[in-house]
Amino acid sequence: METRVFLKTKIVALKARARRLAQIDYASVGIRPQDLPYAPSPNHFRAANQRLRKIDREIQRRLAHLQASWSNSSIHRVLLDIALVEREVDRARRAFGLFFEVFGQRGTTFAPVLAAYDAIAVDCYTAIRQVAPQIFRGPLLKPVCYMEHGFSPATMRRGVQLNRLLGEPNPFPVIRIPWDRDNPWQAVFLHEVAHNLQADLGIWQ
């Protein structure tokens, strides 16, 4: 009896947490009107929200099954179903955390520098399009840069399944810049942009 009471309390807590991370927007990450020139595009937020909504649908599906079956299922089965819901909540937390970290820096003093990095990356893609206009299949979301600890810049390519996101694919390229390398003209940054170009051109090895 006490175990069932505990499980019911656990399920109520899961339900309360389940929809807290289903959407992200400019205001929620602290981007003010004066920050908009440096902010990621609405399409970047749209892609992020599509990913969050997809995860949320899976959370709601598993949660609905749990709520409908827990009272008549074995303790072992209920614990397993709770774990499956918690895994999806963790997936939402990780995805939301990545988007919040990347987007939220556009409301800080690093925003102009990060926007400059973005502009350089876009120029690299533009140069390819000018030479071969049909080489990319339709529009592509540009790379978005953010600051993080590390020794050198690094990239997370479009569509790559990330351990950080429990295997969720990356919806757009993300380039990490170390805190002490906020100089957009550094050549090593172009190296990371080139990795993304290789991937988007289908020649990544």
Predicted segments with their positions:
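Charged, low-complexity, helix/coiled-coil-prone segments
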Residues: 24, 50-69, 123-137, 173-183, ...
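Generic detector of ordered, mature protein regions
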Residues: 65, 72, 83, 130, ...
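Short, charge-rich amphipathic segments
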Residues: 38-62, 113-125, 160-166, 183
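Low-complexity, highly charged intrinsically disordered N-terminal segments
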Residues: 67-151
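Short, flexible coil/linker segments at or flanking structured domains
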Residues: 2, 133, 163-165
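Active-site scaffold of zinc-dependent metalloenzymes
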Residues: 100-113, 139-189, 193-200
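Metalloprotease/metallohydrolase-associated module, dominated by Zn2+-dependent proteases
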Residues: 204-205
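N-terminal low-structure segments adjacent to metalloprotease catalytic domains
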Residues: 1-90, 97
